[in-house]
Amino acid sequence: MISNNVIDELFLIGLPPNTTVGGAVYTRWGRTKCGASSKLLYEGYTAGSWYEHKGGASNYICLPHDPQWGNYQDGFQNSGTKIYGTEYEMGHYSNDPFQRINFGGKNFKDHDAPCAVCYTQGRTSHVMIPAWKTCPAGWTREYHGYLVAQQNSQYRTEFVCLDEAPEVVAGGVANKNGALFYVSEAYCGHSLPCPKYVHGRELTCVVCSK
């Protein structure tokens, strides 16, 4: 039985409270809106662990704009992990294949990255495919872009698909670091078959649902 609170939340994001129709949830990295056929659950700030910290988490997360606090003790106790915002580093150590149509044609290096969490009603599966720009037959393309992660000399993160035309967090330009986004490139000669992969070429990605 679906609760009244959940029904209210579904109405708020424009979804009918129909428990017989499932869906999937994905994160659109670098954007504040979802694709035309998806519903926005929330938008926020891309966040993760400090790029030089060997501990903490290795994944990126999408923090909502308005946190809801539970029990807390202000001030750092040095007993837990810390979460930082995420900066674009394209154009520094890596190439910049991204479109700038959502940022007035300007360079977005050192700007903070937004994110959007999206719901695909009626399409219950989603997948991120690296090195593809299109989806398999029968699948819906939610967005496409380029594969990003932290740089090789930094501590490891997951690979995520950054939208091909990123946006930035307003007022978030400063070289303060935190978690970082660098473009991923194919590296031949160490188990990766080349061709068809090309040494040093930036890798695309696509997020698909069905």
Predicted regions: what they are:
Residues 21-198, 202-210:
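Folded, disulfide-stabilized extracellular/luminal domains of secretory-pathway proteins
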Residues 1-13:
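N-terminal, immediately post-signal peptide pro-regions of secreted/luminal proteins
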